[in-house]
């Protein structure tokens, strides 16, 4: 089983090579690193080239944005599973791919190889570098989970069949990965397998969290959920958010008490 770790970069400075070196440290797993660079001029790509590692393949081509860059990266990937790791983000430890392979192999042994009619997503939780805590995700993907909190993009391994019918839609500037995830699990019959251990160290603080992007993200979320959830599901999700005090929970999950809050979330998920 081979993994393609796809990284899209543009003048990323030292973050690119830091991410690459972290990926290269993975143990007991077959993988390649596909770097799709948008014609950087800061020398960041040259530092990676200097590593002279055969597991790294670099493609330099202009793109229209990060999701277009990811689509280009997919076209150069030869792995059985794709993982998208942004510059500055890292795997949680050096055995993430080993655990992903074990989880995927367990599914394949029980259910068979992923196909275009039944692709496979393997996912886990993320460690937030900003909050200094693990943000746990639900072990079951339901319409409510799709509405409120899907797995972090960097914490997902997609079987290549997930992209056989269609790629990311770059017209969604902030939530193209969210749209593709909902399409995958709610419309394209994609199976999901949960890995309990954290997958990535998410840096945060990038474009998607800027005030402009947050506003656009909300608009895209509204449009996307209307496409994939029924009116009843949307009503249920909105009522759930109100009854469970979502604004308060959001504040707790990212504030000084984030470690305590996320630990409680982990215990709740384990009991389900």
Task: Identify the function of each model-found stretch.
Residues 21-30:
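Short, acidic, metal-binding catalytic loop of nucleotide-sugar glycosyltransferases
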Residues 90, 94-135:
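Conserved donor NDP-sugar-binding/catalytic core segment of glycosyltransferases
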Residues 82:
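Short aromatic/hydrophobic "clamp" motif used to bind/position activated sugar donors
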Residues 61-77:
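Glycine-rich, basic loop-to-helix element that forms the pyrophosphate-binding segment
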Residues 37-46, 86:
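A conserved acidic beta->alpha catalytic loop
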Residues 2-4, 32, 179:
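Cell-envelope/extracellular polymer assembly enzymes that use nucleotide-activated donors
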């Amino acid at each position: 089983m081979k993994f393609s770790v796809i990284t899209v970069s543009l003048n990323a400075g030292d973050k690119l090579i830091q991410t690459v070196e972290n990926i290269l440290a993975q143990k007991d797993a077959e993988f390649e690193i596909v770097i799709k660079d948008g014609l950087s001029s800061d020398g960041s790509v040259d530092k990676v080239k200097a590593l002279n590692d055969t597991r790294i393949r670099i493609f330099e081509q202009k793109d229209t944005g990060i999701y277009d860059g990811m689509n280009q990266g997919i076209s150069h990937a030869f792995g059985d599973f794709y993982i998208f790791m942004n510059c500055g983000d890292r795997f949680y430890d050096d055995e993430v791919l080993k655990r992903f392979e074990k989880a995927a192999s367990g599914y394949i042994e029980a259910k068979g190889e992923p196909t275009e009619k039944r692709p496979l997503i393997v996912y886990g939780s993320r460690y937030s570098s900003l909050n200094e805590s693990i943000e746990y995700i639900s072990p079951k993907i339901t319409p409510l989970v799709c509405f409120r909190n899907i797995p972090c993009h960097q914490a997902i391994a997609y079987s290549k069949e997930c992209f056989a019918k269609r790629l990311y839609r770059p017209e969604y500037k902030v939530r193209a990965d969210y749209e593709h995830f909902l399409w995958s699990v709610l419309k394209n019959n994609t199976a999901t397998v949960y890995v309990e251990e954290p997958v990535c160290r998410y840096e945060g603080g990038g474009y998607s969290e800027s005030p402009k992007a947050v506003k656009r993200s909300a608009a895209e979320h509204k449009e996307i959920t209307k496409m994939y959830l029924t009116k009843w599901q949307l009503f249920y999700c909105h009522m759930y958010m109100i009854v469970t005090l979502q604004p308060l929970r959001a504040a707790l999950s990212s504030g000084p008490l984030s470690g305590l809050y996320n630990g409680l979330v982990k215990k709740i998920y384990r009991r389900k």
